[in-house]
């Protein structure tokens, strides 16, 4: 077997990118001479993440699947275009493996891999698979799951399925809390409340926290806040903190999340599959506000995995802003004041954590390559 090329496909949100990067790191560590190449979308979040990796990459014109006739036609056309681009790139290599992780970029690349006869793997981190993974399962040889319950959502696949957890980048296995504290200028004598809407930010979480700032000032002597806003809300959130006596660090984005989680005592955030896995592996008690607009409510199911073991609580992101703020404060205030309960929740995270997922998937991909 000559040099193997591993083609990773996913993008549009961090939840489709970070698991692939985690596995790519492990493949590279085990097989240093392997080529790592990514297919990703045109969205800004993809560019922001991939520009720092040093991996080869190709941008695809693929778009999401919608019921609107014009958007549906666009999906079909860009799917075909993306499949052709991927086929040309993959066909240049002597030996290849394709790995998809959902998102509208993954489908055409998995299809390209199947048409070329190379091994195809899927990484599915949500309990309920998205449309891309549901579609791509027909072309997959192996599917790697975060949750055992996901098996029932792939009834027609011929692929072998493995429940391994959600792959996280290697830094999560060896985080450095002191690095994050120094990097962000935090007070090592104060607890850290992390507010995050994942890679793209959350306007509704941002607004809720900003409305709670007067109440949060009661905890200013013992707590500090790291607030990751996303690009769109940064200026407004920064302004909201002005004039408060809260110690805070407001950023639109932060790349060292493993180190930051290690320094965090409580997190408020969404419950995407990657976020839930990060909370668990990092051992951080969480207040989860599942994204309310997914039809399958998969973020509620993800967060449920933390509440089942006592590692997190769920707050409904209801439509009424006043009600949302009141519900959040009802959970947040007692948790900030109860060190013992937070310690119990942090310990409970171990029951949900699967820190070796990336390593296990990488080992299987290398075995798949040997059959090519």
Regions found by a protein language model. Give the residues of each.
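Donor-nucleotide binding loops and adjacent catalytic segments primarily
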Residues: 39, 44, 49, 53, ...
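A short, well-ordered alpha-helix in the C-terminal region of glycosyltransferases
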Residues: 341-355
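An amphipathic, basic-hydrophobic alpha-helix
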Residues: 65-97
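C-terminal alpha-helical cap of glycosyltransferases
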Residues: 354-372
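Acidic donor-binding loop of glycosyltransferase active sites
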Residues: 94-97, 262-277, 284-285
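Glycosyltransferases and closely related glycan-assembly transferases
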Residues: 28, 85-98, 106-121, 134-138
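Active-site-proximal region of nucleotide-activated glycan assembly enzymes
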Residues: 35, 56, 114-178
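Conserved nucleotide-sugar phosphate-binding/catalytic loop shared by glycosyltransferases and other
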Residues: 3-11, 33-78, 164-167, 231-233, ...
């Amino acid at each position: 077997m000559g040099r193997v090329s591993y083609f990773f496909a996913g993008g549009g949100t961090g939840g489709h990118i970070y698991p692939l990067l985690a596995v790519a790191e492990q493949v590279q560590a085990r097989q240093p001479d392997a080529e790592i190449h990514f297919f990703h979308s045109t969205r800004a979040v993809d560019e922001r993440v991939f520009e720092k990796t040093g991996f080869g990459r190709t941008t695809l014109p693929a778009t999401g699947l919608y019921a609107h006739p014009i958007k549906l036609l666009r999906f079909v056309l860009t799917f075909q275009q993306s499949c052709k681009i991927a086929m040309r790139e993959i066909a240049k290599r002597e030996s290849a493996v394709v790995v998809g992780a959902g998102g509208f970029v993954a489908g055409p690349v998995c299809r390209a891999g199947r048409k070329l006869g190379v091994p195809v793997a899927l990484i599915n981190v949500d309990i309920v698979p998205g449309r891309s993974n549901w579609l791509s399962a027909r072309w997959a040889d192996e599917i790697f799951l975060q949750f055992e319950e996901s098996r029932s959502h792939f009834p027609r696949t011929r692929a072998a399925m493995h429940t391994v957890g959600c792959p996280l980048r290697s830094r999560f296995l060896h985080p450095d809390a002191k690095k994050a504290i120094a990097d962000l200028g935090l007070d090592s004598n104060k607890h850290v409340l992390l507010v995050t809407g994942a890679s793209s930010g959350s306007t509704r979480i941002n607004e809720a926290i900003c409305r709670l700032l007067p109440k949060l000032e009661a905890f200013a002597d013992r707590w500090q806040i790291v607030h990751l806003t996303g690009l769109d809300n940064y200026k407004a959130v920064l302004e909201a903190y002005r004039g408060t006596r809260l110690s805070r660090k407001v950023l639109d984005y932060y790349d060292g999340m493993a180190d930051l989680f290690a320094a965090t005592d409580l997190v408020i955030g969404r419950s995407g599959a990657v976020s839930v896995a990060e909370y668990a592996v990092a051992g951080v008690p969480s207040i989860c506000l599942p994204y309310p607009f997914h039809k399958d409510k998969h973020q509620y199911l993800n967060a449920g995995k933390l509440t089942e073991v006592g590692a997190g609580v769920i707050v409904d992101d209801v439509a009424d802003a006043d009600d949302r703020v009141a519900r959040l404060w009802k959970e947040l205030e007692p948790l900030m004041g109860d060190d013992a309960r937070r310690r119990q929740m942090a310990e409970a995270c171990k029951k949900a954590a699967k820190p070796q997922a990336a390593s296990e998937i990488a080992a299987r991909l290398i075995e798949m390559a040997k059959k090519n």
